[in-house]
Amino acid sequence: MLRGAQVTRRGKITTKGELYMKKPVAAESASALVDERIRELGDWRGKALAKVRELIHEADPEIVEEWKWRGTPVWSHGGIVCTGETYQKVVKMTFAKGAALKDPSRLFNSSLEGNVRRAIDIHEGEKINEAALKDLIRAAVALNLEGKSKSKSRRASRKRAAS
């Protein structure tokens, strides 16, 4: 172990204060860590993150919660759907393939210049368009699953061509 590093329930804190995870976190543990994050925040950000989480699970009951990148809640189904980051003045939902999604309700209001990701910044007091967010989540899941089935069919056709 590094001199001066400390160990927590989530992993090892390095001397630079970074959380260093030894193993991937199991889904049950990830959900418990998201619960803990919501409680730790204890303000409007915790309530917003809890609401976002609720809407994600309503939109796709099969979604999997993960805990990645030194403490970021991640929701996946066939690949990463979105993350839930909390900052001092904003709760940010970053959609991994957001640039490929149609957003008729114009929920995306951040990371608009990127070629792949898009984000929704939720500020204190803002109301979430629940129906539009659920539609966006469902579209992100469908895009992930569509990509998986395309890659499976490509592999199968390459195998047939090779034989």
Kindly label every feature range from the protein language model:
Residues 1-163:
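Charge-dense, helix-prone N-terminal extensions
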